């Protein structure tokens, strides 16, 4: 389903109605309010998710401080960057050049060397004699992965050379652990219908799980890491942290690269800390966490989500916008899923659809402050887009919020009526209700460049948003559906398939994992950008899917985070690399 833009008809001019509000005033098209404390006398009959308080309080955020000061290392960092650029020119061997590009990217340094990486890949893509031999499995697989990852048109037919006369991959390949690992990673960038890559994935995963003998410990570590989750599915900033530590263990590491990666990670971490402090103050001033006690207060978790989706340091404004959106989505989701009655939710959905401050008059007290927070924050975001890029984005932002609330109300009606949707019916609504289109839509207009509206209706863009959101939804369902159904929520994808196909939960879970694989294939086809300016959105779409795997890999990392989730937050936001 393509996102359709509304005809711009929204006006910032409204006649406010201060009904039952203590204070109401406009500030730059924004309404600030304090509402009388909501009554909880009607708690009887309302559901509860029993969410625990966040592991992170404002004191943790405000005391975040890194000893690392980039200004103290500026000249050294410039020298290291010069060393790396010189190295990229010095290396002549095509395989070594590709390995260097791969290492730079995995260390989290790709954004610093975009121009140089593009030059290398252009040379490789246009050279008909990149390799004198096509028998090097590692080289062929690495070339395929890098080119496809960067949007070049590349065929997987080269892998047929590694098959025997019976049509299967040669058993002799099992001795080449490095090549097998490269093929395994490359297989996760497949498109639908690329059977050879499906076969490659099955072949490599089976044999890599069974490796034994005297194997290089660093290579073995990489194999186990990839089998746990392939690189293409991993949250890239956490992956950079892991790879920096792993690269340190390699005998052939380049000292300049290793040093630069640590300095860059620490430098970017200080940017994240500054942004998180600003977001924490915004959330505290907004007051929703205190007013709506039934909802999840997950500001740090939302910021962690955001850094996974938009991690390049230059997109600080976009991270701020997306953090606000993520926390509002989390709150409104709890209004629909946990607290609101069907009658109240119908009113709230109508109010969002109208996008008029007067629509608040019909809402109960707890919804007024929620609606006003949504209205104000969205208008603030739109004001920045108008001021910085000259774009009136209100019609589009209103559209994605309305679509989200309408998808929520569909699920609320299903729950109220005891209706069990088919899997297809559920997913057609659920890829919207997971809020991926809201997140990516806001991100698109916050990258700091003038983005054309019509690009959001390109088939490639619509497909990216849908399949990224679908992966998000299915990963969420695998981790959270049991708890949500136990508290009386609408059946999720697992339960829908169980009812429809008459299978066990275990079989249904395997089917959902299969759907995730298929969604990745469809999304991989979006790697080729129709226009260059869409690249930040393409990156964000893929990173949204990666964050879904990260957050829901070991349970509900958003609603009920565990010690592993806590450790990940600390690694990304609080623990810099130490220098001797």
Curated annotation (Swiss-Prot):
GO biological process, one term: monoterpene biosynthetic process
Residue span of motif DDXXD motif: 333-337
Residues annotated as binding Mg(2+) 2: 333, 337
Functional pathway: Secondary metabolite biosynthesis; terpenoid biosynthesis
Residues annotated as transit peptide in the record: 1-26
Superkingdom field: Eukaryota
The keyword Magnesium is annotated on this UniProt entry: yes
Keywords of the record: Chloroplast, Lyase, Magnesium, Metal-binding, Plastid, Transit peptide
Subcellular localization, as worded in the UniProt entry: Plastid, Chloroplast
InterPro entries: Isoprenoid_synthase_dom_sf, Terpene_cyclase-like_1_C, Terpene_cyclase_plant_C1, Terpene_synth_N, Terpene_synth_N_sf, Terpene_synthase-like, Terpene_synthase_metal-bd, Terpenoid_cyclase/PrenylTrfase
Main location per the UniProt record: plastid
Comment text on domains: The Asp-Asp-Xaa-Xaa-Asp/Glu (DDXXD/E) motif is important for the catalytic activity, presumably through binding to Mg(2+).
Family membership noted in the UniProt record: Belongs to the terpene synthase family. Tpsb subfamily.
Protein name: Alpha-thujene synthase TPS3, chloroplastic
Organism (species): Litsea cubeba (Aromatic litsea)
